[in-house]
């Protein structure tokens, strides 16, 4: 992680990650724009972030939300595979869900998501707003799985009480990375 884009909050970091994924697909001329998110997830209260949040109670008051978002069961690779299509640009997940209970991704699930993304040209977004910054024993939860995401979001603990968030485009080449966040 050699470059970080700072934001005002975790929700804004996730909003930036969604925009970066769509911009990446646009730049690569893939025609992809859809997202797969997980049930019981929480990604923020901005319009894009609430659109990929896996709780009806957060989304319903703002419907219609961003189109092209489908929800898979957390820790169920078959559920994710069933949703992948030629329009999927990214899969967003929290390695450790906090809003839907303390749900930890399995090793098999994280490795499977990375494989699905690699085989289908899909970006993997890890939302570590709640679980990052040493809260799982590693600096970031993904490190414990040995599964590196393409985009990483973080907040809360990085500010030590000051509202700040950030996103990093990890596996995206330099020229494309600059286009996505400039």
Where are these regions (language model features)?
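Short acidic, glycine-rich surface-loop motifs adjacent to enzyme active sites
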Residues: 88-102
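Generic enzyme active-site microenvironment
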Residues: 17, 92, 125-126, 148, ...
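Single conserved hydrophobic/aromatic residue that forms the stacking wall/gate
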Residues: 170-182
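Short acidic, glycine/serine/threonine-rich loops at helix termini
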Residues: 16-19, 45-51, 102-103, 134-139, ...
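PLP-dependent aspartate aminotransferase-fold enzymes
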Residues: 1-90
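Active-site PLP attachment segment
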Residues: 138, 144-173
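Active-site nucleophile and cofactor-binding loops and adjacent substrate-binding regions
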Residues: 5-12, 130, 155-159
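Catalytic PLP-binding core of fold-type I/II PLP enzymes
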Residues: 85, 103-137
């Amino acid at each position: 992680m050699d470059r970080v884009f700072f934001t005002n909050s975790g929700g804004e970091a996730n909003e930036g990650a969604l925009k970066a994924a769509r911009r990446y697909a646009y730049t690569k001329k893939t025609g992809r724009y859809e997202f797969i998110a997980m049930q019981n997830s929480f990604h923020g209260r901005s319009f894009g972030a609430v659109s990929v949040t896996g709780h009806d109670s957060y989304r319903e008051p703002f419907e219609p939300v961003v189109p092209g978002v489908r929800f898979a069961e957390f820790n169920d690779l078959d559920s994710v595979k069933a949703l992948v299509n030629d329009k999927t640009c990214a899969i967003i997940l929290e390695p450790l869900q906090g809003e839907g209970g303390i749900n930890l991704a399995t090793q098999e699930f994280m490795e499977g998501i990375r494989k699905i993304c690699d085989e289908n040209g899909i970006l993997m977004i890890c939302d570590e707003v709640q679980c990052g910054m040493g809260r799982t024993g590693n600096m970031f939860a993904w490190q414990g799985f040995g599964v590196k995401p393409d985009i990483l979001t973080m907040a809360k603990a990085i500010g030590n009480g000051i509202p700040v968030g950030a996103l990093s485009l990890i596996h995206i080449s330099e020229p494309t990375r600059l286009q996505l966040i400039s």
